[in-house]
Amino acid sequence: VAAIFDVSFGAELTVKSYLEHIKGNSPDLVIAQPCPALVNYAEIYRPELLGSFAPADSPMLHTIKMIREFWPRYAGHRVAVLSPCIAKKREFVQTGFGDFNVTMSRLKSCLDERNIRLSTFPEVDYDNPPAERAVLFSSPGGLLRTAERWHPEIKERTRKIEGPRIIYNYLNSLEKLRREKKAPLLVDCLNCELGCNGGTGTDYKNS
């Protein structure tokens, strides 16, 4: 491992891109797009919503592009993403960025099998600058909390929603809400009820 980067910094770039899009283009609806499961659902079942997904890279893609541009010494290195999401692999394939999707649960299994305890190693800093605003991005409502730090007023025009029991029904009704001018400006949505931190690639039930 040549370097370790924190994707929270990329999340700040993602949120900034959202806000610039809202300010510059005045859309009537912006759907958060870091969750590949929701994007894939819209591609298959709700293509009418695709034009409303935020035209911005996910935090992971922002981070990888940042590495390529500002750390050229790693240009030839492959990128392994420590991820809470089994669906992230689809994003790698579709965009051509990212080489390995190493889920947190898989990493934990590998460490346990080899009797490796991370607590026995010294702490080290990330190789990129620390995030200031987006450290909570991967938790439910993290996008909204990050955006509020720049624009507090956006909270009144945002719908925060997560969890497979409700999110897909909501997406199914969203185009109708838009036509009736009842849709929020920003939809902060995730497939997993506990946010990415409790994603399908984590061991959150035993944590």
Describe each PLM feature range.
Residues V1-S207:
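Iron-sulfur-associated redox domains of electron-transfer enzymes in respiratory
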